[in-house]
A protein has these predicted regions:
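Intrinsically disordered, low-complexity regions enriched in Ser/Pro/Gly/Gln/His and often acidic
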Residues: 3-4, 62, 112
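Solvent-exposed, well-ordered loop and adjacent helix/strand elements within mature globular domains
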Residues: 50-91
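Short hydrophobic transmembrane-like helices used for membrane targeting/insertion
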Residues: 1-2, 12, 26
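Residues at secondary-structure transition points
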Residues: 13-17, 62, 104
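Proline-rich intrinsically disordered, low-complexity coils
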Residues: 9, 20-21, 36, 78
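Extended, low-polarity transmembrane helix blocks
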Residues: 21, 27-58, 88, 92-163
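N-terminal amphipathic/hydrophobic targeting modules at extreme N-termini
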Residues: 5-19
Length: 163
């Protein structure tokens, strides 16, 4: 019983120390994120993460529907026999880009490091180029045009992450 009483102040001091350490880390993180360039890097990484994770997860959970639609979409193209492989490739690439961008957003907020966000932005840019190519081959010019803002965002993200 006496040992427990003497350990109590030590436990309280340890708890205070860890609480202060967490508060310092949060303060540092907020100070980082309040810088305009860091905030823009964080926000674009988060945007790319949401965009590509949602798109990739939609393809995973609605694979059969997407495959059916894309099979018709590419039926009159040289890629008509590769639709399933293309869908799997794009799905994996989108999920990976989204995960890297999400890890990058966390990394930017926590330490200011840009590595994961850069890899995510670069892969996202390549994904958009692949989608654009597919839309052009399928002669879906409106669909291809709708990808241009995403391409601009992804390239801007890559450039922003070099600052």
């Amino acid at each position: 019983m006496i040992a427990k009483c003497t350990d109590a102040p030590r436990r309280v001091d340890t708890l205070r120390f860890h609480t202060l350490l967490c508060l310092e880390a949060i303060t540092f993180m907020l100070q980082q994120l309040l810088q305009p360039i860091t905030f823009a890097q964080f926000a674009t990484a988060l945007f790319v993460a949401i965009l590509f994770l949602q798109s990739g997860l939609d393809k995973v959970f609605n694979f059969a529907d997407n495959l059916g639609w894309l099979t018709g979409h590419f039926s009159k193209t040289p890629f008509r026999n590769q639709v399933k492989a293309m869908l799997v490739t794009i799905t994996v690439a989108e999920m990976l880009a989204g995960l890297l961008a999400m890890a990058g957003a966390v990394q930017i907020a926590w330490s200011g490091q840009l590595t994961c966000a850069m890899y995510g932005a670069q892969l996202a840019t390549i994904d958009i180029v692949l989608l654009f190519f597919g839309q052009r081959i399928a002669k879906d010019y409106a669909g291809a045009a709708s990808l241009v803002p995403y391409f601009i965002l992804c390239v801007a993200d890559v450039l922003l992450l070099t600052l």
